[in-house]
C-alpha cells in the first residue's frame, strides 16, 4: 500500500486506512503494522478493541462427523449450475445433520452448522488468531479420524460455513 500510495502521488494525510483483524494479540503492534503497511504515521491510527463473541457448543468432531463432511466432492458443489444442484451434492450432509426438507441452500446450511461442534470450534479458534489450515484437522476432529479425511472435512466445512446464512443479506456463518 505504501508503494502504491507513493507511485500515485498521494500524500499520507490524504490516505484513510481501516485495518481490521482479530489475529493481533497486541493492539499496539496492530497500530505499528497498519502504519508500516500504509506508510502513515502511527499516531494517525486509533486502536479499537472489542470482546470476542465465542460460539457455544464448540467440540471436536467425531469420525462420523468427518465422514459426513468428506462424503461429497467440493468441486461438484462449486461446479453445480444452480442451488438445487448444490443441494443434491450436500443432501447426505444435510440429512446427517437432521435438517428437514424442503431445503434452501443458505438457510439449510445455516441450520446444519449453527450448532455443529466442529463449526463452532473452527469459528472460535480462527477468530483469535490465524491458523495454519493443515493443522486444523487435528484441532477440529478427534484423534481417530485419519489425517487425510480430517483435512478434506475441514476444507468442506470452511466452504459450507462461508455459504451458510440465515438470510441472504447476512454474512456467512464463518466470518
Language-model segments: what does each one mean?
Residues 1-10, 14-16, 20-175:
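Helicase motor interdomain insertion/brace
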Amino acid at each position: 500500500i505504501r508503494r502504491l500510495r507513493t507511485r500515485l502521488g498521494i500524500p499520507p494525510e490524504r490516505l484513510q486506512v481501516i485495518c481490521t483483524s482479530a489475529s493481533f494479540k497486541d493492539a499496539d503492534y496492530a497500530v505499528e503494522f497498519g502504519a508500516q503497511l500504509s506508510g502513515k504515521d502511527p499516531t494517525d491510527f486509533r486502536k479499537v478493541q472489542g470482546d470476542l463473541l465465542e460460539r457455544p457448543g464448540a467440540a471436536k468432531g467425531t469420525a462420523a462427523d468427518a465422514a459426513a463432511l468428506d462424503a461429497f466432492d467440493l468441486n461438484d458443489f462449486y461446479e453445480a449450475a444452480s442451488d438445487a444442484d448444490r443441494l443434491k451434492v450436500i443432501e447426505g450432509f444435510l440429512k446427517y445433520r437432521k435438517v428437514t426438507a424442503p431445503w434452501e441452500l443458505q438457510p439449510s446450511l445455516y441450520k446444519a452448522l449453527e450448532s455443529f461442534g466442529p463449526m463452532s470450534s473452527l469459528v472460535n479458534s480462527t477468530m483469535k488468531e490465524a491458523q495454519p489450515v493443515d493443522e486444523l484437522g487435528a484441532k477440529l476432529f478427534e484423534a481417530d479420524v485419519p489425517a487425510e479425511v480430517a483435512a478434506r472435512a475441514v476444507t468442506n466445512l470452511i466452504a459450507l460455513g462461508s455459504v451458510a446464512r440465515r438470510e441472504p443479506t447476512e454474512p456467512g456463518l464463518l466470518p
